[in-house]
Swiss-Prot record:
This is Endonuclease NucS. GO terms for cellular component: cytoplasm. Pfam families: NucS_C (PF01939), NucS_N (PF21003). It comes from Pyrobaculum aerophilum (strain ATCC 51768 / DSM 7523 / JCM 9630 / CIP 104966 / NBRC 100827 / IM2). The keyword Transcription regulation does not apply. Its EC number is 3.1.-.-. Cleaves both 3' and 5' ssDNA extremities of branched DNA structures. The lineage of its organism: Archaea, Thermoproteota, Thermoprotei, Thermoproteales, Thermoproteaceae. Disulfide bonds: none annotated. The gene is nucS. Keywords: Cytoplasm, DNA-binding, Endonuclease, Hydrolase, Nuclease.
Length: 250
């Protein structure tokens, strides 16, 4: 069925679904619902068995695979990825490739229940409480992260980037803190691990803490492998605490 702002098909054939995905992404966004398996390969490997899922493809290359629970996708590829849909063995396949680092996501549909493409706009978001504001609030209130922390540096330059906060704990041990305002992914974990490894090579006794509004399941797994810690914050509450959010001013 054709509409002014897009198109949709219920129970499409694999060929119909592939055509709609490949042409529809130019409009802005494609959504597909169906029974599928998902396979991720890259820095690690992961797979999801067959069940009904929501798959979202965006014009900028973003791919999101959602299930019935939680806000974050189960598996995803970021903007800049290349996506194509095709039919293989009588099944619809959606393949997303990220070049750097090389990561692929393959979604294989056993059945497609619904697929739609819509003309969706893109705007700039004005944040109240940016990531820099969150860092500033944590610097003023380091006990939010951990009791006894003393901040010794902010935006500290290193050979692998600028670390957000450098602190010492109550035992005098250095603590490197990586801050993400919203959802932390494996990239944030890898960056924190690089900072910690750099300081350890220089002979420092150091540990790392990732502070964020939330963390993906895969990122949390990597965090534990590296022996790092996670502290969850609520950026909105943090801004209210430090009087940085004018929307909450009385």
């Amino acid at each position: 069925m054709q509409q002014a702002v897009g198109m949709y098909v219920e129970a499409p054939t694999p060929d119909e679904a592939a055509r709609l995905i490949n042409s529809g992404r130019k409009l802005g966004i494609v959504i597909a619902v169906g029974v599928c398996e998902v396979f991720y390969t890259g820095r690690a490997a992961a797979s999801l068995g067959p069940t009904r899922r929501l798959v979202i493809l965006k014009r900028d290359g973003t791919l999101l695979v959602h299930e019935a629970e939680k806000a974050q996708p189960k598996i995803w590829n970021p903007p800049g990825s290349s996506t194509a849909a095709y039919v293989e063995g009588g099944k619809l396949v959606v393949k997303s490739i990220r070049s750097r680092p090389f990561e692929t996501v393959r979604v294989i549909f056993d059945k497609v229940d619904f697929i739609a493409a819509f003309d969706v706009g893109a705007t700039e978001l004005t944040l109240v409480g940016s990531e820099r504001d969150v860092v500033g609030a944590l610097v003023k209130n380091p006990s939010i992260i951990e009791e006894g922390l003393e901040v010794v540096g902010v935006e500290v330059p290193t050979d692998v980037g600028h670390l957000d906060i450098l602190a010492r704990d109550k035992n005098g041990r250095y603590v490197i803190i990586e801050v993400k305002r919203d959802l932390a992914t494996h990239e944030a974990v890898f960056q924190l691990a690089r900072y910690v490894e750099l300081y350890r090579r220089k002979g420092y006794d150091v540990r790392g803490i990732l502070v964020a509004g939330d963390i993906t399941a895969s990122a949390y797994d990597y965090l534990k492998r590296y022996g790092l810690n996670f502290v969850k914050i609520n950026p909105r509450e943090l801004m209210v605490l430090t009087n940085k959010n004018p929307l909450n001013a009385k």
